[in-house]
From Swiss-Prot:
InterPro entries: 4-PPantetheinyl_Trfase_dom (IPR008278), 4-PPantetheinyl_Trfase_dom_sf (IPR037143), ACPS (IPR002582), Ppantetheine-prot_Trfase_dom (IPR004568). Its main location: cytoplasm. It catalyses: apo-[ACP] + CoA = holo-[ACP] + adenosine 3',5'-bisphosphate + H(+). It comes from Rhizobium leguminosarum bv. trifolii (strain WSM2304). The gene is acpS. This is Holo-[acyl-carrier-protein] synthase.
Length: 134
């Protein structure tokens, strides 16, 4: 059963300006080490960071909190499976809120899609509760 849906659309230029203005202060505040390593290797660095930023916003909306209630940017991280498929890993308050959303006997599955078409980046998150027996 679906227990949360979130989406976000962001202007890549806004993220590029934040990186130019604040540099590591911005990237270290909002992104995990894995996200920074992946984005810094990209030719389109700003687009890579923007997609991850949009994913965090979408995830916070799917959790029903936004970036509030103790949920911080780095509590939500975009990681890629060996196939390249992006997924979200939650920690801290985000993980606790997700756990509180789950019906008894269920485990979470977070589905994520991210895309960009300059000057926009977009993310969709669906949080699903799956029976533990599956």
């Amino acid at each position: 059963m679906i227990i949360g849906i979130g989406s976000d659309l962001i202007d890549i230029r806004r993220v590029e300006k934040s990186i130019e203005r604040f540099g590591d202060r911005f990237t270290h505040r909002c992104f995990t080490e894995i996200e920074r390593a992946r984005s810094d290797r990209r030719a389109n660095r700003g687009a890579s960071y923007a997609k991850r930023f949009a994913a965090k916003e979408a995830c916070s909306k799917a959790l029903g909190t936004g970036i509030a209630q103790g949920v911080f940017w780095k509590d939500m991280g975009v990681v890629n499976l060996p196939s390249g498929k992006p997924t979200m890993v939650l920690s801290g308050a985000a993980a606790l809120i997700l756990e509180s959303m789950l019906p008894a006997g269920h485990r979470p599955a977070i589905h994520l899609t991210i895309t960009d078409d300059y000057p926009l980046a977009q993310a969709f998150v669906i949080i699903e509760a799956l029976p533990e027996s599956l």
